[in-house]
């Protein structure tokens, strides 16, 4: 029987719930216990932003995958969310798929040892 190895207890659902309360987060977040959702998205780091368009027939298409904005720890650029906000605005205005999507930059996803996706190895 496989026993999940806890390598980052601070990322547990209980601790994330506490962090959300302390930080005043009002947005939903997903606990991906088996990391299948992250693998399906080919996620690599956090934070990583995905915006889907609802096609109205039960299908959702990936419209934006990228950074929140140009801010990074230590670069003194204030958080603005401009890249994600621009993508949301474009999607709401039925504009075409944004061609300039900057990849996210952050901490690698902590994959379960032995269960890392092929692109991570």
State the predicted function of each range.
Residues 3-22, 36-38:
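Structural microenvironment flanking redox-active thiols in thiol-disulfide oxidoreductases
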